[in-house]
Amino acid sequence: MSFETVEYSLNNAIATVTMNRPDALNALSLQLTKDLDAAFRRAIADGARAVVFTGNGRAFCSGGDLREMQSMWEKEGRIEAFLEDPLGALHGVIRVMRETPLPFIAAVNGVCAGAGVNFALACDIVIAADDASFREAFVRIGLTPDCGGTFFLPRVVGEKIATELFMTGDAVSAQRAVEIGMINKAVPAASLLDEATQLATKLAAGPTGSIGRIKRMMNASFSNDLTEQLALEHECQIESGKSTDFKEGVAAFFEKRPPNFTGS
């Protein structure tokens, strides 16, 4: 299966999904949205153990495709033509990213704006090129954030900084994004994909069942109270304790050798 606007590869159980509309700064057209959904689902079906998500060209993703939006607006005579079904499709992709147990690593190159920022934040770990920039740009064209921005950003930078970034639409450098906890780290642009792939390789070699359960617990931690979270931790620990990987991990510890985890 090939995709019109996405490049997909699977190597050593690592799926690399690359947005491929460089001339449009990887703006999220309806076709790109459909291709991302299909590519992420293919990674799951292919048995990938980690996903690297990036963009071709000088942008990770510049946000929604304003040209397509304007065209649909003019054709249908109402902006809802773009903001209903296509926006719902975008939100569906976000849910796939968050609900699959696979770890997602964003490798953010260059421009990252609007919905592109929120797609990056939907990943479990975000690595950026040191020349990348992040901008919650919605307000600059009179829109409000979507694609989970008001869910993800306050959780990583706090309410006040998130509110400022949403209301001003100001750009944030990669270095500043690290300082405020928006992303995990910034690396030289030339080594961005290597850094992301190395981390994906490390995660893919780990006990991916446990990693998936960690993701599930982290997703739930902001809505659960302490009692509920302790109960979920108990449930996940029991599941992990029954796994083959736990037995392998303990055996490797006592035998003083690296574990050979299989995800089972």
Each model region followed by its residue ranges:
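Charged catalytic carboxylate motif
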Residues: 31, 35, 89, 96, ...
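Short, charged, surface-exposed hinge/linker loops at domain edges
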Residues: 215-224
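Terminal low-complexity tails and localization/encapsulation signals of metabolic enzymes
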Residues: 1-3, 251-264
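Glycine- (often His-adjacent) and acidic-residue-rich active-site loop
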Residues: 55-96, 112, 225
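Conserved CoA-thioester-binding segment of acyl-CoA-metabolizing enzymes
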Residues: 1-56
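Crotonase-fold acyl-CoA enzyme core
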Residues: 6, 95-209, 238, 242-243, ...
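Terminal peptide-recognition signature
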Residues: 17, 21, 36, 53, ...
